[in-house]
Amino acid sequence: MALVPYTDSGVQSLKRFHDSSASFKFVNHNIEIKQDWKQLGVAAVVWDAALVLCMYLESEGIHLQNSSVIELGAGTGLVGIVAALLGAQVTITDRDLAMEFLRMNVRDNIPKDSLHRVSVRALNWGKSLEEFSTYDFILGADIIYLEETFPDLLQTFLHLSSQQSVILLSSRLRYQRDHDFLEMMKLHFTIADVYYDKNTDVHIFRAQLRQRKEL
């Protein structure tokens, strides 16, 4: 998730994001996520798309036990934390500026005997991808929103995906450009809208690389 600096405009409708922390319960764990809108902006608060994806992972029988998982644009790290609590080996990523913030949330919410299954790494989409391998699951919550990042995000998906990889994208489709990105993905991936939460207007999309004969 891109780091956007704090501005005063429009934040009155986003009062909950100004709380220094947010509490949740997933996988029978009480999770306390620190937030820092003022310093890190949209990357440092919990958005609806992250909550919907966490609920989906827990309630829809997604088998993450011992799977390799990477979260892109992790922001607060909530999705990656829940994936780890579900038994996955998780790499939680965002830009360099978010690293210490992410590590703090991971340390606060992952049991000490499970910390070895979680790594926090900087990943700028489209750059230094050779440092990363493929993963069983690639997760992203509200990462489809800056059009200038779309080519790099698509390149990152392609690098991280094998034929068996599953991408789960949770997003509120606010603008035409969001739909356009999904169309870009369809050139390389099969995509299905697998879940819709009407209360938050958030969709979850499941994507997998097309078989070579389909390209």
Swiss-Prot record:
<feature type="binding site">
    <location>
        <position position="125"/>
    </location>
    <ligand>
        <name>S-adenosyl-L-methionine</name>
    </ligand>
</feature>
<protein>
    <recommendedName>
        <fullName>Protein N-lysine methyltransferase METTL21A</fullName>
        <ecNumber>2.1.1.-</ecNumber>
    </recommendedName>
</protein>
<keyword id="KW-0808">Transferase</keyword>
<dbReference type="Pfam" id="PF10294">
    <property type="entry name" value="Methyltransf_16"/>
</dbReference>
<comment type="similarity">
    <text>Belongs to the methyltransferase superfamily. METTL21 family.</text>
</comment>
<keyword id="KW-0963">Cytoplasm</keyword>
<dbReference type="InterPro" id="IPR019410">
    <property type="entry name" value="Methyltransf_16"/>
</dbReference>
<dbReference type="GO" id="GO:0005737">
    <property type="term" value="C:cytoplasm"/>
</dbReference>
<keyword id="KW-0489">Methyltransferase</keyword>
<feature type="binding site">
    <location>
        <position position="47"/>
    </location>
    <ligand>
        <name>S-adenosyl-L-methionine</name>
    </ligand>
</feature>
<comment type="function">
    <text>Protein-lysine methyltransferase that selectively trimethylates residues in heat shock protein 70 (HSP70) family members.</text>
</comment>
<dbReference type="InterPro" id="IPR029063">
    <property type="entry name" value="SAM-dependent_MTases_sf"/>
</dbReference>
<feature type="binding site">
    <location>
        <position position="94"/>
    </location>
    <ligand>
        <name>S-adenosyl-L-methionine</name>
    </ligand>
</feature>
<feature type="binding site">
    <location>
        <position position="141"/>
    </location>
    <ligand>
        <name>S-adenosyl-L-methionine</name>
    </ligand>
</feature>
<feature type="binding site">
    <location>
        <begin position="73"/>
        <end position="75"/>
    </location>
    <ligand>
        <name>S-adenosyl-L-methionine</name>
    </ligand>
</feature>
<dbReference type="GO" id="GO:0006479">
    <property type="term" value="P:protein methylation"/>
</dbReference>
<dbReference type="GO" id="GO:0016279">
    <property type="term" value="F:protein-lysine N-methyltransferase activity"/>
</dbReference>
<keyword id="KW-0949">S-adenosyl-L-methionine</keyword>
